[in-house]
Amino acid sequence: MASNILTKIFGSRNDRLLKTYRKTVDQINALETQYEKLDDDQLRAKTQEFKDRVAAGETLDALLPEAFAVVREGSKRIMKMRHFDVQMLGGMSLHNGKISEMRTGEGKTLTATLPVYLNALTGKGVHVVTVNDYLASRDARWMGKLYNFLGMSVGINLPNMSREEKQAAYNADITYGTNNEFGFDYLRDNMVYEVGDRVQRGLNFAIVDEVDSILIDEARTPLIISGQAEDHTEMYLAINKVVPLLTRQEGEADPRTGEGVTTPGDYTIDEKTHQVFLTEQGHESAERILFEMGLIPEGATLYDPANISLMHHLYAALRGNLLYHRDQHYVVQEGEVVIVDEFTGRLMSGRRWSDGLHQAVEAKEGVQIQAENQTLASITFQNYFRLYKKLSGMTGTADTEAYEFQEIYGLETTVIPPNRVSKRDDQLDRVYKTTREKYEAAIKDIRECYERGQPVLVGTTSIENSEIIDQLLIKENLPHQVLNAKQHAREADIVAQAGRLKMITIATNMAGRGTDIVLGGNVEKLIEAVEADESLDTVAKEAEIARLQTQCKQENEQVKTLGGLRIIATERHESRRIDNQLRGRSGRQGDPGSSRFYLSLDDPLMRIFAGDRVRSIMERLKMPDGEAIEAGIVTRSIESAQRKVEARNFDIRKQLLEYDDVSNDQRKVIYQQRNDIMDASDLQPQIASLREGCFADLTRQYVPVESVEEQWDVAGLEKTLRDEWHIDLALRQEIESATAITDEEVLEKVSAAAEAAFADKLEKIGKENFTQFERVVLLQSIDSHWREHLSALDYLRQGIHLRGYAQKQPKQEYKREAFELFGQLLDSVKNEVTKTLMTVQVQSGEQLDQAAEALESRAENITNVTYTAPTETGEVETTVDEASQRRQQAVAGSAMPRVGRNDPCPCGSGKKYKLCHGKLT
């Protein structure tokens, strides 16, 4: 209460920020008359003037009023749109590295042009991040007209572009693209072998459109580049037969007494955490079945070391069969299991679940099982976007997640007031006892809207529910259009016309996000279709366009009279923000509109979190069948349940980040080392450091620290140096001839001998000739061990929670063991690189060049590379055949088959392998 009183007196933090920004808006508005008098060339020349002033040391903040005024004037001339004052407020918020919450229809795309232009003046590049390729291309073409007019270059970063096309896109002043593609380019840039193969030029400033979708909804799933691992097809098929033979344990036991279990069984399901667990009886049943199938020997248990992988397969099969359902979590298309995005209901073609889950679902559905993937490179969106020097974002719904944006990304949320106050009527939820009653009420509402001509947008949380509504509307003979993951290619066109008279549109969650629903229809989309119609001549096109403009204007007035766009939702999403996004489709720019949620006690959110409380209310009121409860207390109860889920999901994302921060620190070290190696003209300091460490470790195996001569194994050290390292050192003679010698002096002699042997090799071949070979050996060793390290971290992460049973803190244990694993990685690289460079036998510089090319070729020619990422559109790239065609996509480890000594050399020289590159091994 005290905080409310203080807010009324002093204003909120948001109010104070906006008050400061409005003073700057007054300065911008004061420049408008002055800039209107400039001709196009004079206005365009302002860009170079600003760039010169920035180069001379003037800050962007000082330039802001003039730069924003130039963009506004350019937009008036080119786009025929003038930035509203509230858009200026949003632009300032974005420039200051904050999140701007602007309601649907307030012109976020145009708002972004202000800070984008201002920050592009530095010449360091600005990235505008969107949720899908359609929006990236649309916005780049649309706003590109304005940027080009002002003398700025614009690039579009899309999947399947060549290296040269991507480099051109990134070298532009402003680059549009998706979060996935920006992230994958970063990973690929840290997998290349040549400096010229990188495409990005640094991460300066990013503006993330639909920032809540990218930084919140998709933050639990990292970007992963993976390649196929060992094939376990037969094992998946066999284990899939085990699950139907197991039974579920029904009921719930009292943890204190153990009483209350009505039906013993083999496994339990926790719907809240989306997990399945074997009971003690389940372990015994599974072991018996696996023994009968011949998969484990008699008397063996699932916890035997030899059966660890079997346990992995069994749990994957349990999850795939019991927790993941067709047409809800995935669909089967053309013999493939395609994941459905839980946030948008769209297909995520090319994305695959990890840990064998996808293969388990494929076995369940009887489709072809594809091999498991090994992670080659990975990063979370949290850690990728925190690499930018400055980050900001915009969305229609950020305030409910303001704490998470601040906590995880350090981003403050600024709520920008609308240009016109919304007239949308958000009606109370109606809760029914059963799903059937809920759908009957929703269909009745839809029919009433249709009969009076009011357009309706029906929101669902899954494809399955959208198809139920679809069938019910067909049964009622109500014409409608369906917008879900199965038709996402047409979604922008469908959404654009969802505001026309008598239009009924069914949409999964926020399908079509980024496209406005204009009352009476989007005339621009209709005009595009007319202009693309080759059967019409110019006169006919002009006549049709005039007719459409008149028709849409008339329909707009009619729809407003009827109450605007009606939103009908058939389920609450677990996030209030997603519900608000659906509501936000209606009432744009001061238009009328209304929304209503129809719920039942059988809905997942209600059943798990709020059902008992609402059910008791309905029973006390003795409500008859078909009657709904409609009260503020019910809506508040549901929102309370949503807050619980949001808090749990936040904890999950925060925990993921805490674990990923460990690998992120290591990733930074590895990537920095790779970049240093590629950028260095002389690698001898790095090689010398590795060699010194390697031979110190080797020597200490035979001559321990602070030991006496009697403890030394000099003969063993001499033999190892000679046999494994090709170094002849008469160490025993030197020790015998010396009056006294310490272990440190022995180490110095070994190091000196190693350095001399390497120096001889360099002198014979030439330092310049050896550098590229050293570079490739270093990079390949780092890459291969980094991939193994990622797999080791994955396995460590999966089982680390068990440390809690030993009274240890899992997170601290993970950090400790991950650090130890990283130390092992560095040791492995040190030893492998040193051994390769010390023992390689080379006769000429030409041989070295061929060897370097062969090593690099092995890293570039792998196929079956898979890109995994969460996305709204399902445009996740799965590259198999194209991997060898795209230079920046290719580095994924060795795919060269083993070559026989008498086989032709893979380098293409025509010589036998033993007479060509075989000499080097």
Swiss-Prot record:
Its cofactor is Zn(2+). It is found in: Cell inner membrane; Cytoplasm. It is a peripheral membrane protein. InterPro entries: Helicase_ATP-bd, Helicase_C-like, P-loop_NTPase, SEC_C_motif, SecA, SecA_CS, SecA_DEAD, SecA_motor_DEAD. It holds the Pfam family SecA_DEAD. CDD domains: DEXDc_SecA, SF2_C_secA. One of its GO terms (biological process) is intracellular protein transmembrane transport. GO terms for molecular function: ATP binding; metal ion binding; protein-exporting ATPase activity. May bind 1 zinc ion per subunit. Its EC number is 7.4.2.8. ATP binds at residues 87, 105-109, 516. Zn(2+) binds at residues 905, 907, 916-917. GO terms for cellular component: cell envelope Sec protein transport complex; cytosol; plasma membrane. It catalyses: ATP + H2O + cellular proteinSide 1 = ADP + phosphate + cellular proteinSide 2. PANTHER family: CHLOROPLAST PROTEIN-TRANSPORTING ATPASE (PTHR30612:SF0), SECA INNER MEMBRANE COMPONENT OF SEC PROTEIN SECRETION SYSTEM (PTHR30612). Monomer and homodimer. Part of the essential Sec protein translocation apparatus which comprises SecA, SecYEG and auxiliary proteins SecDF-YajC and YidC. NCBIfam families: PRK12904.1, secA. Part of the Sec protein translocase complex. Interacts with the SecYEG preprotein conducting channel. Has a central role in coupling the hydrolysis of ATP to the transfer of proteins into and across the cell membrane, serving both as a receptor for the preprotein-SecB complex and as an ATP-driven molecular motor driving the stepwise translocation of polypeptide chains across the membrane. This is Protein translocase subunit SecA. It comes from Polaromonas naphthalenivorans (strain CJ2).
